[in-house]
Amino acid sequence: MAAPVLLRVSVPRWERVARYAVCAAGILLSIYAYHVEREKERDPEHRALCDLGPWVKCSAALASRWGRGFGLLGSIFGKDGVLNQPNSVFGLIFYILQLLLGMTASAVAALVLMTSSIVSVVGSLYLAYILYFVLKEFCIICVTTYVLNFLLLIINYKRLVYLNEAWKRQLQPKED
């Protein structure tokens, strides 16, 4: 017996709009964070727009050891290793991946979206811990990306539940 063919299922409009808004914000914040990191490398005295006071300094957090490779990849692959990129590069890749995979309603895409969201939230919790307890700073850019990652987790969870229900309805035997 052949496997059942699932009809095309579309996601709700609110999900697409929310995903585009969150991913667009994430992409823009990642680009800005990358800019701040580069400027801080070029000029250590550079004051970014997100440096609002003595306790609110995004450039200090972004230029710290934990601003590259999550503070982990440098010790594994070397400070100049190809994988020891600024966290903003990983964020940019993540938000673009979320945006592109969000355009399809496949089961594999939904699982990749959910898995990558879980990883991003775990990473956000780790970086939030570093930000608060180690660096003792408040980075508005960082915290905003943590919130965006959590919102994407919710959006992806809702998508998985919605698609699962739609596919279940398609697979149920039709009663005449």
Curated annotation (Swiss-Prot):
What this protein catalyses is: phylloquinone + [protein]-disulfide + H2O = 2,3-epoxyphylloquinone + [protein]-dithiol; phylloquinol + [protein]-disulfide = phylloquinone + [protein]-dithiol
Q: List the disulfide bonds.
A: 50-58, 139-142
Q: What is its main location?
A: endoplasmic reticulum
Topology, Lumenal side: 37-87, 136-138
The residues that the entry says bind phylloquinone are 142, 146
Membrane topology label? Multi-pass membrane protein
- Its biological function? Involved in vitamin K metabolism. Can reduce inactive vitamin K 2,3-epoxide to active vitamin K, and may contribute to vitamin K-mediated protection against oxidative stress. Plays a role in vitamin K-dependent gamma-carboxylation of Glu residues in target proteins.
Look up the further comments and give them.
Vkorc1l1 overexpression cannot rescue the lethal phenotype of Vkorc1-deficient mice, suggesting that the protein does not play a major role in vitamin K-dependent blood coagulation.
Protein name stated in the entry: Vitamin K epoxide reductase complex subunit 1-like protein 1
What does the organism's lineage look like at the top?
Eukaryota, Metazoa, Chordata, Craniata, Vertebrata
